[in-house]
Curated annotation (Swiss-Prot):
Family in the record: Belongs to the SecD/SecF family. SecF subfamily.
Lineage of origin: Bacteria, Fusobacteriati, Fusobacteriota, Fusobacteriia, Fusobacteriales
Function: Part of the Sec protein translocase complex. Interacts with the SecYEG preprotein conducting channel. SecDF uses the proton motive force (PMF) to complete protein translocation after the ATP-dependent function of SecA.
An example Gene Ontology CC term for this record: plasma membrane
Protein keywords: Cell inner membrane, Cell membrane, Membrane, Protein transport, Translocation, Transmembrane, Transmembrane helix, Transport
GO molecular function: protein-transporting ATPase activity
Alphabetical list of Pfam families matching this protein: Sec_GG (PF07549), SecD_SecF_C (PF02355)
Compartments it resides in: Cell inner membrane
Subunit-structure text: Forms a complex with SecD. Part of the essential Sec protein translocation apparatus which comprises SecA, SecYEG and auxiliary proteins SecDF. Other proteins may also be involved.
Matching SUPFAM superfamilies: Multidrug efflux transporter AcrB transmembrane domain
GO biological process: intracellular protein transmembrane transport; protein targeting; protein transport by the Sec complex
Transmembrane segments: 12-32, 127-147, 152-172, 182-202, 234-254, 262-282
Stated name of the protein: Protein translocase subunit SecF
Topology in the lipid bilayer: Multi-pass membrane protein
Organism: Sebaldella termitidis (strain ATCC 33386 / NCTC 11300)
């Protein structure tokens, strides 16, 4: 590969800025399609006399959703002994009775083991914990990369990670995919995946920078470093995306948002690791203190001045 990354870096900055603004616009205007985990709802546990077909139950619930608003967002869990656990949005007593009667007519007789209202406490608590995890993770990343590399690498990596998270969340908001607890897990997974790619590239940049000792322009050092790891990064991401695509196709509706979130996040994570984080390092390098003068009067060229 012979990518001229630094020559077109402004294009990537403009694209990323546009995507961030678009994501913020979607989040503040369209909001999120919150699932039962965050809004609360009703839970029905039923033990059917005969085995229940997942396909038949899904079809029945889809048809019933046009009549009963609480079924527009639902989750079904199947367990041994013909037991089905159905979670829906909040419904009044009249709607609950109608749903239970129609299920009996469509799927056969059952024993109603439990019918309760559930709150959104768990989902809200998880969302709060996820925000704390994101904040703490960003701080730890800053500390770790500052120690292992230097502050310009640390700041660049955190900015790239926040970009990945924001754009992914904006995508979910724009297309109004249901936000549930697995969505939070997907966001945290994206952080780890993107960080791994970024560190691999940064390590190669640092290695080459030390090797040339300032004799080669830093922009060329970045281009050379990215070209050496480009194929590895892309192939790793493609392998993961193929596995996620299979899960999206065959995994059913329960994991739909989780899989879509990971797909989008990994695509943007790969993009940001290569086309955003590295140019950010180049941009931030000009804020470093100028190199000290050596005793013999010669200037230390270990750090080349970067002109943007």
């Amino acid at each position: 590969m012979d990518l001229k990354l630094m020559k077109t870096r402004n294009v990537y900055f403009i694209f990323s800025t546009f995507m961030i603004l678009f994501s913020l616009f979607s989040i503040f205007t369209k909001g999120f399609n919150l699932g039962i985990d965050f809004t609360g709802g009703n839970i029905y546990q039923m033990k059917f006399e005969k085995p229940v077909s997942k396909e038949a139950m899904d079809k029945t619930l889809k048809e019933m959703a046009s009549k009963y608003p609480s079924l527009k967002s639902n989750k079904v869990q199947y367990s041994e002994g013909n037991t089905v656990l159905l979670r829906t949005q909040i419904a009044d007593e009249k709607e609950k009775s109608a749903i239970l009667e129609e299920l009996k007519a469509e799927q056969g007789n059952y024993e109603l083991i439990k019918a309760d209202a559930v709150g959104a406490v768990v989902g809200n608590e998880l969302a709060k914990n996820a925000l704390w995890a994101l904040a703490l993770g960003s701080i730890l990343i800053l500390i770790y990369i500052t120690i292992r590399f230097e502050w310009i690498y640390a700041l660049s990596s955190v900015l790239a990670l926040l970009h990945d998270v924001l754009v992914t969340i904006g995508f979910i908001s724009f297309f109004q995919f249901e936000v549930d607890t697995p969505f939070i897990a997907a966001i945290l997974t994206i952080l780890g995946y993107s960080m791994n790619d970024t560190i691999v590239i940064f390590d190669r940049i640092r290695e080459n920078d030390h090797k040339y000792g300032g004799k080669k322009p830093f922009a060329d050092v970045i281009d050379e470093s990215v070209n050496k790891v480009f194929i590895r990064s892309v192939y790793t991401s493609l392998t993961t995306l193929l596995a996620l695509a299979a899960l999206l196709i065959f995994g059913g509706s329960t994991l739909r948002t989780f899989n879509i979130t990971l797909l989008v996040g990994i695509v943007y994570g790969t993009y940001s690791s290569i086309w955003l984080a590295s140019p950010l390092v180049y941009l931030l390098r000009r804020f470093k203190k100028p190199p000290k003068q050596e005793k013999n009067g010669k200037k230390d060229r270990s750090m080349e001045k970067v002109v943007v």
